[in-house]
């Protein structure tokens, strides 16, 4: 933790560090709210997602300003990527010293920026602080824990996240319950998620299950990929499966023959608007994505999460999410398609009301005085 010149003043900027698609969705309402307050801002894109379909299209869809800098780090092992991120961010923060660094989520760009800023004596604010899966085999869990300990401001999306931070010794005056900025973006674009238009443009079936899988536990082990492919082929006997294929898993799923089933449709990665339209029009969603768990909660679409745990339990207690294993995926999905799962529809998590960006901007503005 550190102190520095007031962030957002004419002499210093609030630096937003983004590097992966979920970061862009979370940053958009914060950048917008601070812009309305006249804050001096700088958007630093690390280039962790370097494909246009994974990155630039999201800036266009969300109306984010063109990044002031793109570090172009790209992919690599966790150590290589994090090291490259830190080198690039240290250069950026030294040449353009920010008054505050705002980081989002739990990707390698998040923890790299927090480490560099803290070592340079620049305050850090973490949006989406306090989420815990309690599974240290997940790289994201390590990133979350380290980032929260380095942060001067911890912006929590749900009450249980505040409890986690308290249990880890984070001072209450650093913690703010603000709601979920990802939901700000979702609610602000509801009239742009046209599932019918997407269905017509991509020639999708009337009834389908949307799938998206990218986590290492699901896509890095060839045996796991083979089993998941078999299960998804079984799902396709119940309903067509439409799956935008993340670059991380494309080669593995191609080798396993996922697209060989006549009722499995594989797509290139989609932009934000198209992806949420695909989700909105689905009869159910199969995923391992944290953000999709949150979006389906608001959209009221049954969500089956192929993970043993989730750092977003509010999507289970308040939303439409259910944890499943590869072994029980098909049976659980069959129930979901028949409406035999208690979806707890309409029970929106606290403060998921489209005003999180304003709350974050308000705290940042007060903090700088």
Predicted regions and their residues:
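Glycine-rich, Lys/Arg-enriched anion-binding loops that position phosphate/diphosphate groups
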Residues: 241
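Nucleotide-activated sugar donor-binding and catalytic core shared by glycosyltransferases
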Residues: 2-238, 249-369
């Amino acid at each position: 933790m550190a102190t520095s010149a007031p962030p957002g003043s004419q002499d210093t900027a609030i630096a937003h560090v983004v590097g992966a698609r979920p970061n862009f969705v979370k940053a958009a309402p914060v950048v917008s709210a601070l812009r309305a307050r006249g804050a001096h801002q700088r958007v630093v894109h690390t280039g962790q997602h370097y494909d246009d379909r994974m990155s630039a299209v999201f800036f266009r869809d969300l109306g984010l300003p063109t990044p002031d800098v793109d570090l172009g780090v790209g992919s690599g092992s966790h150590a290589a990527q994090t090291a490259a991120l830190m080198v690039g961010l240290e250069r950026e923060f030294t040449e353009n010293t920010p008054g505050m660094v705002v980081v989002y989520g739990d990707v390698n760009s998040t923890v790299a920026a927090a480490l560099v800023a803290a070592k340079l004596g620049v305050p850090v604010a973490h949006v989406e602080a306090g989420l815990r899966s309690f599974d240290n085999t997940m790289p994201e869990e390590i990133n979350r824990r380290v980032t929260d300990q380095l942060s001067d401001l911890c912006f929590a999306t749900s009450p249980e996240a505040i409890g986690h931070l308290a249990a880890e010794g984070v001072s209450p005056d650093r913690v703010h319950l603000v709601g979920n900025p990802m939901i700000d973006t979702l609610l602000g674009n509801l009239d742009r998620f046209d599932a019918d238009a997407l269905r017509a443009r991509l020639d999708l079936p009337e009834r389908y299950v949307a799938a998206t899988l990218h986590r290492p536990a699901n896509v890095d082990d060839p045996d796991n990929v083979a089993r998941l492919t078999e299960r998804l082929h079984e799902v396709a006997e119940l309903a067509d499966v439409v799956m935008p294929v993340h670059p991380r898993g494309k080669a593995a799923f191609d080798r396993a023959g996922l697209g060989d089933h006549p009722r499995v449709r594989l797509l290139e990665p989609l932009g934000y608007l198209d992806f949420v339209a695909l989700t909105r029009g689905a009869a159910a969603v199969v995923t391992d994505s944290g953000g999709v768990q949150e979006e389906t909660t608001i959209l009221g679409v049954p969500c089956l999460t192929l993970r043993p745990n989730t750092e977003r339990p509010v999507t289970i207690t308040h939303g439409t999410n259910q944890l499943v294993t590869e072994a029980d995926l098909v049976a659980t999905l069959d129930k979901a398609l028949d409406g035999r799962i208690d979806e707890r529809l309409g029970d929106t998590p606290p403060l998921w009301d489209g005003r999180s960006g304003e709350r974050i901007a308000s705290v940042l503005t007060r903090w700088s005085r």
